[in-house]
């Protein structure tokens, strides 16, 4: 073996160093004699190789060379041979266990394989225990056989005897075949090899032994070369080369401020004289154990063996060691006073380690890790004398060593107190060291008690729902360090709740806060701290425990849309979640909509696999917008109190700025009360003129109302689109201010034009009305032939058409900002229609040339026909129904009641309730035709001309002609007929009128029609004409009226009238027709 690096150093020095060396040599010799006496008493005469503790440790009365059974509690040994030989070869592959039953006879040894199998079952029991459920695998293995873990699994460790519990003997060190040392002697013992051990065990132990050898070889020892006698063999131990000071530390443990040295040594090793002819075998680990226990300076009686890699066993080449190394290995830190004399300590250690071999030994002796000579067999006669000399030298040596470093030794009770305090502080070393290096600079508070959690229910006061600081010197503290370091960089020792803005202190240990932290991809308030977590930019946010619990009415928040309360009582307090806790608990379909186009990203009943998936960015399949769509602003989703349930955003609504080329401008906008339905009468031209809607932000809704109006001013930010909305409002106000003078000028011009047009209309009406009246009264009795009636009617209608065309041109000039009016019927079509209405009963057989008025009159006269004699009342009753577009049966009109008709036009409604006006008073219904005509005329004069009303499409003329009307008549009337326009539609009350009023034409038409009383010619076509009464027009007449219908609504007429008493309207119609019949 190569000599140590310090073995060739010269021993020359001053006289003081030589004196210390001599004293240490004498002390070493006395210790060797003491150990030799102990082993000589316990070694049996048979010379069997066995461990020192096992010589007297026979179980069940079995001697040192006996056998015992494996004490596996289940009784089923994992090996074929259940017997364990009490020798070094067998015990090297065994584990020793202890039973708390003093009278246990099951045994104390298990096979290593059996013990590992049994230990795995105990670990499963520990894992199932509630208190250890949060431990890691490393923690369970570390604390299984300690007091902390064994208390949890004690019941699962029942002994085979049935009266006690087993536990692993942590103090027992199994012997190793490679640790056997042959002493220099006769050499008649056989060589121990590894062949008796299994290869698997060697592989398991290889790594541990290799590390142990590396640590031992790095240490500075005092041994020189190996001397080999002629016929003797000296197997070298793997644990050689360590100094005695490394494995037997001074019991005067050095603690900070105690004034004691730290293993600087009153013990050094050098060779000892002995009997070269004697032989024996000694195990190194056993020697180390008993040398510590039998040391007279070990007042506490503790096993002060150093662990591998510790400060004392890592080598003695340098006396200065970092405090972190000492603390991490469980050793006690070096005194600061001792660090003041580094040069003196190095000289002293070098002098203690350099031990030249004296000539009195006669040969070079091998030294093991304890610095003991391999020749330990000394004559028993010399042992007592050497023991007395050793005690005297040690008593004299203590003051000498104390004076070397100027330290004062402590009494035994003080040593015990210091060791106990050091053990108690070992748990806190890790946390204190981490706290000092986490960059927090001590700005966080230390929690004194847990009284703040008394507000929680008793069922939540446990370690599962409140994060508690773990005990032990283990890690797994990344979350705490992440939070504290992030807050320390921002110099924040307290945070604010995101909901109630209550300040919360941050503590340096779990629970870190009286609430919970979470990371959100959106900054909910200005108090959220921007952090980097796993390469993502997130915001550290906090919620207090009162808001999480939600038991207080002032802290509860509800969803704005479904009004479901948010409950965070299931979250763990005092720690941090790596996702947005509000987004992870969606309550309704509004949470799954895109932030841009408001379309559903997933089905409302569908849920993601993990809570953190809701905080990740996704791409909308409709608008291709990539965003964290499931994370919504808190002010947008939640409210403290909601009086009414707010409407949801429709899926078809466009964003605030509608993209070009889309049809989003024609969509409806929902208000606070609900979204209006689309009307069938609206046209594309009207929708194209409407400005683009703003569905994302409604200025009428106070988005700051739900969350802490007074407590949390920073959180009450406006809606995400509020700023954009405000900018648009400002721009609109500026444009309006600029356009106000122009609009005022235009309004004044329009008013002057309207006044002029009204005057012209009144003059034309006064000029035209006498002509018509004279024509009506003077010519009607004289005209008896049909041809003259047709010519007179043609002249009247031609004049009417000319006046109508002139007025239309004037209106187009005045109303240049409105849509062009629809084209009216041509003169040819109008004359054809009027000529068709004057035909005799022979022409009435043709349905293609019939009209609504002819059908009405024919239906009235058809009561005298032979085909209708079975139904004498059918003609008058259905004539009234045909006039008002509904049947007089029990089905009634859509807006009437019973069999009474109504004047309310249900199909022509455009939603403008303010345009309704009474056609006549309910109590003063017209009783004759003159009263009806006068009422129409007075109503027309009261109308403000040229009212700007949105343009309407032509629709059913009958007040009740709609697709929703129903009829129960047996004549085959179909609901589709009600969609046809007819001439009986009454114009609206607020619409724009033409100069020639409609009631004048109505009078001309009635006065110039000749009704034939010949019933014989109408019998063939009575049934066909009767079927057309209900629809007010036949199929061909409806198509003709579409092109030339002078009785439809004006271009800008209003669409709704107030409902009038049905009885008055029916009576007026009957009186009208009675007057008409009397005229003939």
UniProtKB/Swiss-Prot annotation:
Protein name (Swiss-Prot/TrEMBL): Headcase protein
The keyword Cytoplasm appears for this protein: yes
Remaining remarks: Readthrough of the terminator UAA occurs between codons for Ala-650 and His-652. Readthrough is not always suppressed as the shorter protein is more abundant.
Function: Required for imaginal cell differentiation, may be involved in hormonal responsiveness during metamorphosis. Involved in an inhibitory signaling mechanism to determine the number of cells that will form unicellular sprouts in the trachea. Regulated by transcription factor esg. The longer hdc protein is completely functional and the shorter protein carries some function.
Gene Ontology cellular component annotations, sorted alphabetically: axon; cytoplasm; dendrite; perinuclear region of cytoplasm
Entry comment describing in which tissues the protein is expressed: Expressed in all imaginal cells of the embryo and larvae. Expressed in a subset of tracheal fusion cells from stage 14 to the end of embryogenesis in metameres 2-9, lateral trunk and ventral anastomoses.
Biased composition (Gly residues): 218-228
Cross-referenced Pfam families: Headcase, HECA_N
Record localization: Cytoplasm
InterPro entries linked: Headcase, Headcase_mid, HECA_N
Keywords from the named record: Cytoplasm, Developmental protein
Biased composition (Low complexity): 263-277, 801-826, 941-974
GO BP, one annotated term: regulation of neuron remodeling
Annotated spans, Disordered: 1-27, 181-277, 310-335, 655-693, 798-826, 891-916, 940-974
Gene name tied to this protein: heca
Biased composition (Polar residues): 181-197, 232-251, 663-688, 900-913
Source domain of life: Eukaryota
């Amino acid at each position: 073996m190569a000599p140590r690096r310090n073995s060739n150093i010269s021993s020359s020095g001053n006289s003081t160093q030589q004196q210390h060396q001599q004293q240490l040599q004498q002390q070493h010799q006395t210790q060797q004699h003491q150990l030799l006496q102990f082993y000589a008493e316990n070694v049996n005469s048979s010379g069997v190789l066995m461990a020192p503790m096992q010589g007297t440790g026979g179980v069940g009365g079995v001697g040192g060379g006996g056998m015992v059974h494996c004490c596996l509690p289940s009784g089923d040994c994992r090996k074929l041979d259940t017997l364990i030989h009490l020798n070094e070869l067998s015990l090297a592959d065994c584990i020793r266990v202890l039973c708390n039953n003093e009278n246990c006879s099951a045994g104390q040894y298990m096979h290593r394989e059996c013990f590992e199998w049994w230990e795995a079952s105990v670990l499963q029991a520990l894992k199932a225990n509630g208190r250890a459920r949060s431990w890691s695998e490393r923690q369970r293995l570390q604390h299984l056989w300690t007091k902390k873990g064994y208390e949890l699994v004690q019941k699962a460790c029942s002994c085979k005897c049935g009266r006690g519990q087993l536990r692993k003997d942590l103090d027992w060190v199994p012997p190793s075949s490679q640790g056997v040392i042959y002493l220099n002697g006769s050499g008649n013992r056989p060589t121990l090899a590894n062949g008796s051990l299994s290869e698997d065990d060697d592989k398991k132990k290889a790594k541990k032994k290799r590390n142990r050898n590396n640590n031992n070889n790095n240490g500075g020892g005092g041994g020189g070369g190996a001397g080999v006698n002629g016929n003797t063999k000296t197997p070298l131990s793997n644990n050689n080369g360590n100094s005695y000071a490394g494995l037997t530390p001074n019991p005067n443990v050095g603690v900070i401020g105690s004034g004691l040295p730290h293993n600087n040594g009153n013990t050094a090793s050098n060779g000892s004289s002995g009997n070269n002819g004697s032989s024996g075998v000694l195990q190194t680990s056993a020697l180390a154990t008993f040398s510590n226990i039998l040391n007279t300076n070990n007042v506490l009686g503790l096993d002060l063996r150093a662990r591998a890699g510790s400060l004392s066993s890592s080598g003695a080449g340098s006396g200065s060691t970092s405090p972190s190394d000492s603390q991490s290995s469980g050793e006690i830190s070096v005194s600061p006073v001792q660090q003041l004399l580094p040069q003196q300590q190095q000289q002293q250690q070098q002098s203690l380690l350099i031990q030249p071999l004296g000539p009195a030994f006669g040969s070079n002796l091998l030294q093991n890790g304890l610095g003991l000579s391999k020749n330990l067999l000394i004559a028993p006669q010399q042992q007592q004398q050497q023991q007395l000399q050793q005690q005297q030298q040690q008593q004299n040596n203590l003051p000498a060593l104390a004076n070397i470093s100027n330290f004062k030794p402590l009494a035994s009770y003080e040593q015990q107190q210091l060791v106990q305090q050091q053990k108690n502080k070992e748990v806190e070393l890790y946390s204190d060291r981490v706290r000092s290096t986490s960059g927090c600079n001590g700005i966080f508070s230390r929690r004194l008690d847990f009284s703040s959690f008394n507000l929680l229910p008793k069922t939540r006061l446990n370690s599962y729902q409140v994060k508690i600081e773990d005990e032990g010197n283990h890690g797994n503290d990344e979350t705490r360090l992440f939070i504290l370091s992030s807050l320390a960089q921002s110099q924040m020792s307290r945070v604010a709740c995101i909901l109630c803005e209550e300040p919360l202190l941050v503590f340096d240990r779990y629970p870190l806060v009286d609430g919970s932290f979470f990371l959100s991809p959106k900054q909910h308030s200005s108090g959220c701290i921007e952090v980097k977590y796993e390469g993502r930019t997130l915001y550290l946010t906090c919620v207090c425990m009162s808001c999480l619990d939600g038991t207080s009415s002032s802290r509860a928040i509800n969803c704005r849309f479904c009004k479901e309360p948010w409950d965070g009582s299931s979250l763990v307090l005092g720690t941090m979640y790596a996702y947005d806790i509000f987004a992870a608990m969606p309550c309704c379909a509004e949470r799954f909509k895109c932030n841009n186009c408001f379309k559903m990203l997933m089905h409302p009943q569908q849920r993601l696999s993990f809570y953190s998936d809701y905080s990740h960015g996704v791409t909308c399949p409709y608008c291709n917008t990539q965003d964290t769509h499931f994370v919504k602003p808190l002010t947008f989703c939640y409210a403290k109190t909601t009086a009414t349930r707010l409407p949801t955003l429709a899926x078809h609504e466009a964003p605030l700025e509608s993209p070009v080329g889309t049809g989003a401008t024609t969509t409806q906008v929902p208000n606070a009360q609900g979204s209006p339905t689309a009307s069938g009468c609206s046209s594309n031209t009207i929708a194209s003129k409407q400005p683009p809607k703003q569905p994302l932000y409604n200025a009428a809704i106070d988005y700051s109302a739900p969350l802490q109006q007074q407590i949390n001013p920073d959180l009450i930010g406006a809606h995400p689109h509020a700023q954009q909305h405000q900018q648009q409002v400002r721009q609109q106000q500026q444009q309006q201010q600029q356009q106000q003078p122009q609009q005022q000028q235009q309004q004044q011009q329009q008013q002057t034009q309207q006044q002029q047009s009204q005057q012209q209309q009144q003059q034309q009406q006064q000029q035209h009305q006498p002509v018509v009246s004279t024509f009506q009264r003077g010519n009607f009795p004289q005209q008896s032939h049909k041809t003259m009636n047709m010519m007179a009617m043609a002249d009247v209608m031609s004049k009417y058409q000319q006046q109508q065309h002139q007025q239309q041109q004037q209106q187009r000039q005045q109303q240049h900002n409105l849509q062009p009016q629809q084209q009216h019927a041509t003169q040819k079509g109008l004359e054809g229609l009027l000529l068709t209405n004057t035909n005799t009963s022979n022409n009435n057989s043709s349905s293609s040339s019939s009209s609504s008025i002819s059908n009405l009159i024919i239906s009235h006269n058809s009561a005298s026909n032979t085909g209708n004699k079975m139904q004498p009342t059918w003609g008058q009753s259905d004539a009234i129904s045909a006039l008002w577009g509904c049947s007089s049966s029990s089905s009634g009109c859509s807006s009437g009641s019973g069999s009474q008709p109504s004047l309310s036009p249900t199909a022509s409604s455009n939603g403008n309730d303010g345009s309704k006006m009474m056609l006549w008073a309910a109590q003063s219904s017209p009783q004759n035709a003159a009263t009806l005509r006068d009422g129409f005329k007075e109503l027309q004069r009261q109308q403000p001309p040229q009212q700007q009303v949105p343009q309407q499409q032509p629709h059913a003329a009958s007040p009740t002609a709609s697709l929703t009307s129903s009829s129960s008549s047996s004549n085959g009337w179909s609901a589709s007929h009600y969609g046809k326009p007819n001439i009986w539609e009454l114009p609206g009350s607020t619409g724009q009128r033409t100069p020639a009023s409609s009631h004048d034409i109505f009078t001309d038409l009635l006065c110039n029609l000749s009704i034939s009383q010949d019933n014989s010619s109408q019998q063939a076509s009575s049934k066909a004409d009767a079927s057309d009464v209900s629809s007010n027009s036949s199929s061909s007449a409806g198509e003709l009226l579409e092109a030339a219908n002078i009785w439809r609504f004006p271009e800008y007429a209003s669409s709704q009238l107030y409902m009038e008493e049905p009885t008055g309207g029916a009576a007026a119609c009957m009186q009208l027709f009675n007057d008409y019949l009397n005229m003939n």
